[in-house]
């Protein structure tokens, strides 16, 4: 009798659907797009509501320095830049399923941040 009561309690507890935001950042666009497409494809295979990937503006960090180490010679300048690309993916699903989806191979240089909201 107690086993039946436990089974009924388990059936009554609904799996709450959370809004999960996955933020991906990288300096390499190809690796970033590959990880995004893998995440979206796995989420669609599980029949989840997916919004994204949303492409956020690219941050361009620039440093300008003199080419010569001393002050002599012509004044020539060198410019270095680093581009940081960012993508957002929103999922509406229980947190257990997200653990299965995010267990993919993540390319080197891609940072993943997962935030869960109600």
Swiss-Prot record:
GO cellular component terms listed in the entry, alphabetical order: cytosol; cytosolic small ribosomal subunit
Main location: cytoplasm
Modified residues (Phosphoserine): 37
Record PANTHER family: 30S RIBOSOMAL PROTEIN S10 FAMILY MEMBER (PTHR11700)
Keywords noted in UniProt: Cytoplasm, Phosphoprotein, Ribonucleoprotein, Ribosomal protein
Any Pfam family the entry gives: Ribosomal_S10
One GO term (biological process): cytoplasmic translation
Localization: Cytoplasm
Originating organism: Schizosaccharomyces pombe (strain 972 / ATCC 24843)
This protein's record includes keyword Ribosomal protein: yes
Any one GO molecular-function label of the UniProt entry: structural constituent of ribosome
SMART domains per UniProt: Ribosomal_S10
Subunit organization: Component of the small ribosomal subunit (SSU). Mature yeast ribosomes consist of a small (40S) and a large (60S) subunit. The 40S small subunit contains 1 molecule of ribosomal RNA (18S rRNA) and at least 33 different proteins. The large 60S subunit contains 3 rRNA molecules (25S, 5.8S and 5S rRNA) and at least 46 different proteins.
Protein name, as recorded: Small ribosomal subunit protein uS10
Family, as annotated: Belongs to the universal ribosomal protein uS10 family.
Record function comment: Component of the ribosome, a large ribonucleoprotein complex responsible for the synthesis of proteins in the cell. The small ribosomal subunit (SSU) binds messenger RNAs (mRNAs) and translates the encoded message by selecting cognate aminoacyl-transfer RNA (tRNA) molecules. The large subunit (LSU) contains the ribosomal catalytic site termed the peptidyl transferase center (PTC), which catalyzes the formation of peptide bonds, thereby polymerizing the amino acids delivered by tRNAs into a polypeptide chain.
């Amino acid at each position: 009798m107690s086993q039946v009561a436990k089974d009924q309690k388990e059936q009554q507890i609904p799996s709450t659907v959370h809004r999960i935001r996955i933020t991906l950042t990288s300096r390499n666009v190809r690796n970033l797009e590959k990880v995004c497409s893998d995440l979206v494809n796995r989420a669609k295979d599980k029949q989840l509501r997916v919004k994204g990937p949303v492409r956020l503006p690219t941050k361009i960090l620039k440093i300008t320095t003199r080419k010569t180490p001393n002050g002599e010679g012509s004044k020539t300048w060198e410019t270095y830049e680093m581009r940081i690309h960012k993508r957002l993916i929103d999922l509406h699903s229980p947190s257990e399923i997200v653990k299965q989806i995010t267990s993919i191979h993540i390319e080197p240089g891609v940072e993943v941040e997962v935030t869960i909201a109600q």
